[in-house]
Amino acid sequence: MQIFPQTNELIWTIINFAVLLWGMHRFLYKPLLGAIQAREDEINANLKKAAEDRAEAERLRREFEAQIANAQREAQEIINKAVKNATAVKEQIEAEARARAAEILEQATQTIEREKAKAVAELRREVADLAVAVAGKVIEKSLDDAEHRRLADSFVTEVTKH
């Protein structure tokens, strides 16, 4: 008596199933695992490359930021030097202008003094000439008081004209 009436069929089904599993394992599972492993390796390589690229990008960003900071510092130094040079040039121009103004003022003062001295000398010469002329007139005439007064007034008027 058989426990299962179709035991032969069951055994052949189990054998067929085992052969199918073995074939699938040999021809499908291993290549599928290889493809999955290759894909996993590719993804891991891509992730590793992305991490390396990210690290390189971060390094470049820091390097560029350092270069920008350096360029800004150099630009500020150039600006500071330009301002310092401009201030020095301004101070030099102002000093030269003050010196030139003092020189012009000194020359003008000297010219005024010379002209004043000339005018005083000329006035003295004219006064002396007039005094000599008046003395000559006085000597020529004998003057009374009224004539003397008129002559003095004439002398003063002539002096004030010149």
From Swiss-Prot:
SUPFAM superfamilies: F1F0 ATP synthase subunit B, membrane domain
A Pfam family reported for this protein in Swiss-Prot or TrEMBL: ATP-synt_B
Membrane topology classification: Single-pass membrane protein
Keyword Transmembrane helix: yes
Location within or outside the cell: Cell membrane
Molecular function GO terms recorded: proton-transporting ATP synthase activity, rotational mechanism; proton-transporting ATPase activity, rotational mechanism
Function: F(1)F(0) ATP synthase produces ATP from ADP in the presence of a proton or sodium gradient. F-type ATPases consist of two structural domains, F(1) containing the extramembraneous catalytic core and F(0) containing the membrane proton channel, linked together by a central stalk and a peripheral stalk. During catalysis, ATP synthesis in the catalytic domain of F(1) is coupled via a rotary mechanism of the central stalk subunits to proton translocation. Component of the F(0) channel, it forms part of the peripheral stalk, linking F(1) to F(0).
Cross-referenced NCBIfam families: ATP_synt_b
Subunit relationships: F-type ATPases have 2 components, F(1) - the catalytic core - and F(0) - the membrane proton channel. F(1) has five subunits: alpha(3), beta(3), gamma(1), delta(1), epsilon(1). F(0) has three main subunits: a(1), b(2) and c(10-14). The alpha and beta chains form an alternating ring which encloses part of the gamma chain. F(1) is attached to F(0) by a central stalk formed by the gamma and epsilon chains, while a peripheral stalk is formed by the delta and b chains.
Annotated protein name in UniProt: ATP synthase subunit b
Lineage, opening ranks: Bacteria, Bacillati, Bacillota, Clostridia, Eubacteriales
Primary gene name: atpF
